[in-house]
């Protein structure tokens, strides 16, 4: 497909990039949606539509999809956040969601970092892309551990990786238990701090 351009009703596509003609379906509306559940569903759909732009590798796209399902359907983020920053005031949920969607949009948007383009915007997009890449790398490792885990028949009291990394967040409280706990724990703690700064919910 090198040097070849494909034109469709919705996009212009070449070997490295896709230009979306009507980006509205990937962005949240500027007007406020009064119903919070509707707003959350709207954000969820838009984030899933961005999945095809996350990576050329199916493994990365699948990791992103599983990550979204967990974040929207199962994660108790307030518990995770309280481990790091306690009961300090936080940004409104709508603002966190809106900023999170914009973060992913920036991560999948390409603008060359040259003197001829808006360097600050290009650098911001690159930073978002690098952060998302690191986040999905850690998520892939967690998902792999959870998928491979088989509880020992003689140790029914043993806590599995899903309980540790997805529900109790023990790895964020007991960093010294193992090297793996430290890597995942420190990364998740840093992600919470990043969310506090950016007012996102990554």
From Swiss-Prot:
Keywords: Sporulation. It comes from the Eukaryota. One of its GO terms (biological process) is sporulation resulting in formation of a cellular spore. Belongs to the IRC19 family. Involved in sporulation and maintenance of the mitochondrial DNA. Is probably involved in a pathway contributing to genomic integrity. This is Increased recombination centers protein 19. It comes from Zygosaccharomyces rouxii (strain ATCC 2623 / CBS 732 / NBRC 1130 / NCYC 568 / NRRL Y-229). The gene is IRC19.
């Amino acid at each position: 497909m090198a040097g070849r351009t494909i034109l469709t009703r919705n996009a212009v596509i070449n070997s490295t990039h896709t230009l979306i003609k009507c980006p509205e379906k990937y962005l949240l509306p500027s007007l406020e949606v009064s119903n919070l559940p509707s707003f959350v569903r709207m954000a969820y759909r838009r984030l899933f539509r961005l999945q095809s732009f996350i990576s050329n590798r199916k493994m990365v796209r699948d990791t992103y999809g599983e990550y979204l399902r967990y974040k929207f359907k199962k994660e108790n983020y307030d518990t995770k956040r309280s481990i790091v920053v306690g009961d300090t005031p936080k940004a409104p949920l709508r603002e966190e969601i809106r900023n999170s969607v914009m973060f992913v949009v920036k991560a999948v948007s390409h603008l060359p970092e040259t003197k001829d383009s808006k360097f600050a915007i290009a650098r911001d997009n690159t930073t978002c892309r690098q952060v998302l890449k690191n986040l999905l790398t850690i998520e892939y490792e967690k998902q792999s551990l959870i998928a491979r885990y088989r509880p020992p028949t003689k140790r029914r009291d043993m806590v599995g990786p899903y309980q540790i990394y997805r529900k109790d967040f023990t790895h964020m409280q007991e960093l010294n238990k193992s090297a793996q706990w430290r890597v995942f724990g420190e990364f998740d703690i840093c992600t919470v701090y990043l969310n506090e700064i950016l007012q996102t919910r990554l």
